């Protein structure tokens, strides 16, 4: 499933090369969390025969060394489980301003560098991205994943219901 402005003929070979590079650097095997709207599962020949798993993104990220994020809400799991993130895009994806801004906004927020998978990146650059600021992850949780209210969830819901139906 590909909701990005890219062609499979360019995107998948570049992604396969990037995965191979990471596997070599970190001596591990990349496992792909398939998009929930797809039925792609099992061995994907167009991605180097890597395993794709469906509906197990949270579990995969929880047990991972890092997460490779392509404009995905899966970022939330990486934040919650404090996993390093690689924010990736391609030359084609750069042409979609909304998509590219999304990647850049995330890399700015987390004070990291996004990776263009169509360009070469040194091993030292890749390894430097493994280090992340846990405080920024906490800030993200507070800014985007929780309520600003100090009340407990049941109090927020009760207050809402009272305002809507009883007052």
Task: Annotate each PLM feature.
Residues 1-42:
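Conserved catalytic-core segment of nucleotide-activated headgroup transferases in glycan assembly
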Residues 7-14, 121, 149-153:
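Soluble or luminal CAZymes and related metallo-dependent hydrolases
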Residues 32-34, 69, 87-89:
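Short beta-strand/turn micro-motifs composed of small residues
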Residues 40-50, 73-148:
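Catalytic binding pocket for nucleotide-activated donors in carbohydrate/polymer assembly enzymes
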Residues 56-58:
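Acidic, amphipathic alpha-helical patches
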Residues 61-62, 80:
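Flexible glycine/serine/alanine-rich "lid" or loop that lines and gates the nucleotide-sugar donor pocket
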Residues 62-70:
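Acidic donor-binding loop of glycosyltransferase active sites
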Residues 145-167:
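C-terminal alpha-helical cap of glycosyltransferases
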């Amino acid at each position: 499933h590909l909701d990005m402005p890219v062609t499979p003929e360019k995107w998948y070979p570049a992604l396969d090369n990037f995965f191979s590079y990471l596997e070599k650097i970190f001596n591990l095997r990349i496992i792909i969390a398939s998009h929930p709207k797809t039925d792609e599962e099992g061995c994907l020949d167009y991605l180097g025969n890597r395993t794709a798993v469906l509906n197990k993104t949270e579990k995969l990220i929880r047990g991972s060394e890092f997460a490779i994020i392509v404009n995905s809400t899966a970022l939330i799991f990486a934040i919650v489980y404090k996993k390093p993130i690689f924010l990736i895009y391609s030359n084609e994806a750069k042409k979609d301003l909304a998509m590219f801004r999304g990647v850049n906004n995330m890399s700015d927020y987390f004070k990291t560098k996004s990776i263009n998978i169509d360009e070469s990146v040194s091993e030292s650059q890749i390894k430097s991205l493994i280090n992340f600021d846990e405080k920024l992850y906490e800030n993200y949780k507070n800014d985007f994943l929780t309520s600003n209210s100090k009340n407990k969830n049941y109090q927020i819901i009760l207050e809402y219901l009272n305002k809507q139906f009883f007052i």
